[in-house]
Every structure is written in C-alpha cells, then in structure tokens.
C-alpha cells in the first residue's frame, strides 16, 4: 500500500510568495502531473507562476536566503517528478513568459515561448534555420538549457545570446561563445541559471520551401513517434556510435512495460504513459532497460529525461 505523500507547507513562506507574486500566482500542494507531458508526478509544496523577471529574481532570492530547494519548469516536456512530489518551490516560467519579436534575420523570444510557435513565426517571416525545432514540444528556455535538437539541427546552431538570471540574483546576457553548448548540455544547465529569453539568428529563405521542410518533418514524426500518448519525448541520450531506440528494440524490449509506463512499439526510444503510470513506474522501466542493454551490448544508456524529487 502506497504511503501518503508528506506535504510540508510553511505559512510564512506562502505569505512571502503572495507578497512577491500575488495570490493568483501561488498554489500549494499542486500536483505536478498537471504540469508535465508524461502526466505523472506528485504535489509540489509551492508552485508559483510569476508575472515578471523581477518576481523571478525575488523568488529565487527568497529561496536562496531560506535554503528552500527551487526548480524552474516550462511546459514540463522533458521532466518526470517523483510520486512523492517536490519539497520546494516550482517556478513556472511558461504562460506568463511568452512573446516573440522578429527583427530582420533575428528573432527575440521570451523563455516560455514554445519552440513550435517560434518556428511558425520564423516561417511567416521567411526565415530559415529553425525547421528542425518545428515539432519539439518544449519551450525556448528548456530548449536552450539542454541544447535541444532534432533531425540534424540543434539550438546551438541558431542561438546568438541568452538572457539569464544567475543563482546569486544577477541578470546577465551571455553570448554564444559563453554558453558552452554540447550534446544536450550547456553552461546554463551546469550552473543552474534561469533562462529569461534568447536571441536567435536565422537566414532568409523561401516561405514555401520552409513550409515544405516543416511538413516533411511533421510527417516523419507522425509516422515514427507515439504522439498519441503522454510521454517525455526521447527517453535516452544517443550513445556514441549507436541509436538508443535500436538498442532497446534489439534487446527485445519493444512494448515492454512496468505498470503503466511502456516502451513504445512505434519507436523504442520513447517511453509512454499507456494509462495510469506513476513516476516510479517510469524510473523502474528505465533501470530495467539500462540493465538489459548493458548486459546484451555493453552500452550504458543515459536518460535524457530529467528526474526531480526523491526516487
């Protein structure tokens, strides 16, 4: 029998969050399954959707001063939160941080803007270079943080500079060469910075050709990815010299399930919520996949999904 989740709410912290962001922005014991694309996860003690960069800065300062754990989310597309929830502050930089501005060959966007929306804005402006991101179901902030990529393109190819909030409360603009982009990695991720916005550099292109390329990639996704189920996208990073999905398939794990978490039969690189999955199901499924692939092929698969909380 599952134990009841222990929720730790301190009224003085709630009051201080109210003062900073307003009562409408603060929720307590908020189920994180409502804020992740895998649709799993227990309650966050405090869930805050700030309205301004200054509110973010003040909330981070409060958390640092009071030694409260904090974590920033966008639309939760690459995140699995523990069934026990998160004993700290979740900062939702999503709905209140959307905005896209095209200036010549450059696009300036806020962190909560969806990559799909930015790609569409680029197409409408006749700008090419972002077609690869037209189906990535995440925000600009998350995409920059992890150097998201697909179909041969990565965010590092187009990012010119990024506005961040450091953990000590300083708002800085980092140029491309300062971002330390690697495969699903960046300085932003390593140092725990908060992405506030970014400037992207694209190139002029033919609108019809851009649209055709985006449609081609969409058709590939529909054909090969389990878009009809909740998931966290690609489950594993690509091991050098291999494809993660093929290793999982060759290990005989297509359709393999733990509870409601299942290896997609459509694409073995994806784990899906086939119904009623828990975060523990997802974690156990990943562990079993890792063990099986390691045993059969000597390759250690590393999760691309980020896990938050206690497992």
Model-found features: residue ranges?
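A generic local secondary-structure boundary/capping motif
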Residues: 78-79, 119-122, 130-134, 147-154, ...
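Structural signature of FAD isoalloxazine-binding scaffolds in flavoprotein oxidoreductases
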Residues: 41-42, 47-53, 80-98, 145-176, ...
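Phosphate/pyrophosphate- and phosphate-bearing ligand-binding catalytic cores of soluble enzymes
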Residues: 27-28, 79, 165-292, 296-311
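Anion-binding (especially nucleotide phosphate/pyrophosphate-binding) glycine-rich loop
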Residues: 9-140
